[in-house]
Amino acid sequence: MIDRYKHQQLRIGLVSPQQISAWANKILPNGEIVGEVTKPYTFHYKTNKPERDGLFCERIFGPIKSGICACGNYRVIGDEKEDPKFCEQCGVEFVDSRIRRYQMGYIKLACPVTHVWYLKRIPSYIANLLDKPLKELEGLVYCDFSFARPVAKKPTFLRLRGSFEYEIQSRKYSIPLFFTTQGFDTFRNREISTGAGAIREQLADPDLRIITDYSLGEWKELGEEGPTGNEWEDRKIGRRKDFLVRRMELAKHFIRTKVEPERMVLCLLPVLPPELRPIIQIDGGKSMSSDINELYRRVIYRNNTLIDLLTTSRSTPRELVMCQEKLVQEAVDTLLDNGIRGQPMRDGHNKVYKSFSDVIEGKEGRFRETLLGKRVDYSGRSVIVVGPSLSLHRCGLPREIAIELFQTFVIRGLIRQHVASNIGVAKSKIREKEPIVWEILQEVMQGHPVLLNRAPTLHRLGIQAFQPILVEGRAICLHPLVCKGFNADFDGDQMAVHVPLSLEAQAEARLLMFSHMNLLSPAIGDPISVPTQDMLIGLYVLTSGNRRGICANRYNPCNRGNRVNFQNERIDDNNYKYTKEKDPYFCSSYDAIGAYRQKRINLDSPLWLRWRLDQRIIASREVPIEVHYESLGTYHEIYVNYLIVKSVKKEILCIYIRTTVGHIYFYRKIEEAVQGFFRACSYGT
């Protein structure tokens, strides 16, 4: 097991067969060495105990229950006085059951097997190192063809062929007998080679330094030749030079790391610890197993068949042995990377088996899901939606998420207020969702910030603090102005919420991480909280209003007579629907908003709003469009966007401006923001 205090880094590379056996082998008191998995079985169907020498064997991987062997005997773990440490009957070691998370086994392969990652992946390291085409190596690995390897100073079939021709008549009966005997297999195996064993021999023969020097010399020769004038030939030379560079880098890497290239061909296949490929019992006596177990069983079945062919049956044709070696190679390929050679292996339900590569690679793989990023307590995750009514430093948490995040705080509040006598009663009240639970939750949330994070966290603004409030629904509500820091939008993005527990974390969240305190980009200093496209569209809709102008209402086509002057008519193409009603008058913005909420007017309906006396309007030299006189002597001067009511003595009594409810809303929000800014500045000084 890796000690996290002693080991600060992890390196993945090729391992020797001796190291694989050292990981797995254990020596029993009787001198027996265990560690090799020889049987494809998992659990016995009657006793429901692991099969001996199987994929879940307790002798190889350790006991299922701490300190209890397969016989049922118990020993105290860690007690040096307890002797022996192994059960004399079953051979199981008396250790903690957590050993099954890291104790490995191995399968001794009857024939060498090429590691498919180094053969089929791009680039192919085996093909680059041997300087041979990938298709040729594949045909060799999967026994589609063989290559000659005559040995010096020994008779070969090619050398003896001449003597056979002269003595063909005298030996015409003995030669066929020779080809059917076991001696011919030895004779042939010395001359030809196929399978992964041939690859292993080629990887073990050459000197890496010679490969580096030879590749460097060829690269220099190609560089001295210069361009040939033929575009196709120049491209071919360029590709060859690039290949030579990759080959030299690969050879130097093997030299630097002191790794033998023949390790890319496996003789021992490691078996993962059982806890990493579990079998889970479910209701009805059924079980769910990891796909890797089935792939391991497939390898063991085929490997045992090959062992039987090589040991028990001496008269087995060589072609049958080669076919079985190919099946073993394909089984190991499927275990390591299912589907890398084409059609993936499927189960009875037409579901693709998850191989070792599928388990470790990708976003949901072992590294990114478990090692690099782990799930933590006091956290949740949900889709984000816009919260237009929220303040910049607030976020909306769904009730379902909030009650889970702050459950321990709510339980403490229920017990302190004597609403619940113990934790069990408090949890039952939370499950029943009593009203007192939500009241206590509101009190807890008022003094506790939360952290929102959106992956990937590329800079410090990727995680910010907010003051949570309860909202309905199942989505997290977020102010649109903080989206730029998270690089988020509302098209289905998800964000994680975390609860800072310690006082130091809460202080850091309040003083440094609150969203309203991170308004500028830490990189370039530009404003980070700027209106997004959604906000700009909303502001446009809010303030667009009715753009027909004052004249369009007076010269209404629906109410025109013979005195209509079409030259003075102001009509926009997008406003084709008019009414005969006059624009309403309101004494205050509250009356106008109340009328809108009562649905008496629309958001963009034009209206007259009484306004304070504005010197800019009074001093304006604009000529009124028309003047309305009343019976008491007062009169109204009507302009394009405002109206002035004057007395008989030409004193200004009041002013009305022509606006919409949308403009009123927008103006009030701007006014509140400005007043809040000045109030904050006055507090600061």
UniProtKB/Swiss-Prot annotation:
Residues that bind Zn(2+): C69, C71, C87, C90
GO cellular component, one term: chloroplast
Entry note: cofactor: Binds 1 Mg(2+) ion per subunit.
Xref: Pfam families: RNA_pol_Rpb1_1, RNA_pol_Rpb1_2
Gene3D superfamilies according to UniProt: 1.10.40.90, 2.40.40.20, RNA polymerase II, clamp domain, RNA polymerase Rpb1, domain 3
Cofactor(s) the protein requires to work: Mg(2+); Zn(2+)
Keyword field: Chloroplast, DNA-directed RNA polymerase, Magnesium, Metal-binding, Nucleotidyltransferase, Plastid, Transcription, Transferase, Zinc
Enzyme category, top tier: transferase
Reaction(s) catalysed (UniProt annotation): RNA(n) + a ribonucleoside 5'-triphosphate = RNA(n+1) + diphosphate
Annotated Mg(2+) binding sites: D489, D491, D493
GO biological process: DNA-templated transcription
Protein origin, superkingdom: Eukaryota
Principal cellular location given in the protein's record: plastid
Protein's cellular compartments: Plastid, Chloroplast
GO molecular function: DNA binding; DNA-directed RNA polymerase activity; magnesium ion binding; zinc ion binding
InterPro entries reported for this sequence: DNA-dir_RpoC_beta_prime (IPR045867), RNA_pol_asu (IPR000722), RNA_pol_N (IPR006592), RNA_pol_Rpb1_1 (IPR007080), RNA_pol_Rpb1_3_sf (IPR042102), RNA_pol_Rpb1_clamp_domain (IPR044893), RNApol_RpoC1 (IPR034678)
EC number: 2.7.7.6
The family this protein is said to belong to: Belongs to the RNA polymerase beta' chain family. RpoC1 subfamily.
Protein's job: DNA-dependent RNA polymerase catalyzes the transcription of DNA into RNA using the four ribonucleoside triphosphates as substrates.
Subunit details: In plastids the minimal PEP RNA polymerase catalytic core is composed of four subunits: alpha, beta, beta', and beta''. When a (nuclear-encoded) sigma factor is associated with the core the holoenzyme is formed, which can initiate transcription.
Entry protein name: DNA-directed RNA polymerase subunit beta'
UniProt source species: Buxus microphylla (Littleleaf boxwood)
The encoding gene: rpoC1
